Design a protein with these regions (language model features):
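Glycine/proline-enriched, intrinsically flexible loops and inter-domain linkers
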Residues: 2-429
């Protein structure tokens, strides 16, 4: 764990957000995708067994909470990091053995999303026998097997002559390996259960042809700018500084990041606590910079500017240690989009993020969405988290935050709030 960010606000008390960003390295000519190809090729289930945990986990994540709905929370699945590590190593070995045609994890909506998306991306169909799905509970229905979100599971399409090799690899890593179906050319999803057809539907309406929401947006004006000259000066600069330093929003995050190992494999160059985390590409002098950023109070005050600011800050932080940003990802955390004011926050934030990405010539390569973050009708502060990855050619040229000698100059770059047209930008002050 080499970096991160923490924000506090009472609106998160009922919906605590945890956004995680994982970054890895891959050979550009050995990237495996999720498009199923080859009618007749076997569809393989790999990983942990399927249980009833996590059923409707995605649905639960798309609902407001209240005291009456508190009982829904236990539907969230429980991860098993050790099994996850075994599954990761097995997948890498399977890929190295040239057995894999397509692969996708079973995330939200479990086997439903992975099978439908893989078949759709390949322009084909899929048939599966749910009686063959490894289950850890008895009597699971087709509905439960398809919607379970039990963790540490993968769905793969393998080369027909590679099944035995793949089975041996998975058994070596103590993982379930089960052929549960095949790729078809029908453009349909067919599910068998107890010897009967439980489902036979076209794929297109579930994926590309699914209806899109066009929700109404409220006209929410941005907050008026408060000029620095208009701020009451009821306290001394010293008292103001003490109050700011006592704020949880500015206090050290050491109590959080020291609970995690930031030095695994001894390649960490810039540990947590700086502008960006920096790790060495193992066995080389190149480095990868990683950062996540968002200031929710900015987004609440002006969604479009706040969304742009999240991208801009994520872009600035790698440059502050000497790295050059490559691309961003995002996780859009908002309240109930069925409410016009929340939908306006979401839409305007995305527009602002796009504005900044185009100006900075930065691609957005992936993303995630977490909506309906409300409890008893109170929405969270809008929080479009932006993750940035950058590179540095020589880690020896990386720059830290600490001064390195006496007499060095302190320089402020950018607009100064003390200027005539300066403003405090929703600062904590």
């Amino acid at each position: 764990t080499i970096g991160g960010e923490v924000n506090f606000d009472p609106s998160y008390n009922g919906n605590i957000l945890v956004n995680a960003m994982a970054v890895g390295l891959a050979n550009s000519d050995r990237i495996f995708r999720a498009a199923a190809t080859g009618p007749g090729n076997p569809v393989i289930y790999v990983g942990a067994k399927t249980g009833r945990d996590g059923i409707h986990g995605a649905t639960m994540a798309s609902a407001e909470f209240s005291d009456e709905t508190e009982s829904k929370r236990p539907t969230v699945q429980v991860g098993d990091p050790f099994t996850g590590k075994l599954l990761m190593e097995a997948c890498l070995e399977l890929m190295a053995s040239d057995s894999v045609i397509a692969i996708q994890d079973m995330g939200a909506a479990g086997l439903t999303s992975s099978s439908v998306e893989m078949a759709s991306k390949g322009g084909l169909g899929m048939e599966m026998d749910l009686d063959l799905v490894p289950a850890r509970e008895e009597g699971m229905s087709a509905y439960e097997l398809m919607l379970s979100e039990s963790q540490e599971r993968m769905l793969m399409v393998l080369k027909p002559d590679a099944t035995d090799t793949a089975r041996q690899i998975c058994e070596t890593w103590d993982l379930d390996f089960m052929p549960i179906g095949k790729v078809t050319d029908t453009g349909r999803l067919v599910l068998l259960k107890d010897g009967e057809t439980a489902c036979d539907i076209p794929l297109a309406p579930l994926v590309d042809d699914a209806p899109e929401y066009d929700r109404p947006q409220a006209d929410v004006p941005a907050r008026p700018i408060l000029a620095s000259a208009d701020v009451a000066k009821g306290t001394t600069i010293g008292d103001a500084l003490v109050n700011l330093l006592a704020s949880v929003d500015l206090a050290s995050r050491r109590w959080i990041y020291e609970q995690y190992d930031s030095q695994v494999m001894a390649d960490t160059i810039a540990p947590p606590g700086g502008d960006a985390g920096l790790v060495r590409v193992h066995g080389s002098q190149r480095g990868i910079a990683v950062i996540t950023d968002c200031t929710p109070r900015y987004v609440e005050a002006d969604p479009r500017t706040g969304g742009a600011q999240a991208v801009a800050e994520a872009w600035r932080n790698p440059s502050a240690i000497g790295a050059r940003g490559l691309a961003i990802t995002n996780n859009l955390n908002f309240g109930n989009p069925e409410k016009p004011d929340i939908m306006a926050q979401l839409a305007q934030s995305v527009l602002g993020m796009g504005d900044a990405a185009r100006i900075l010539d930065t691609p957005v390569v992936s993303g995630n969405v977490s909506l309906y973050n409300e409890t008893d009708g109170r929405a969270i502060l809008p929080c479009p988290v932006v993750g940035m990855v950058g590179t540095i050619d020589d880690i020896a040229s990386a720059v830290g935050m600490a001064p390195t000698g006496d007499g060095q100059a302190l320089v402020v770059i950018g607009q100064d709030a003390s200027q005539d047209d300066g403003w405090l930008g929703v600062s904590l002050y």
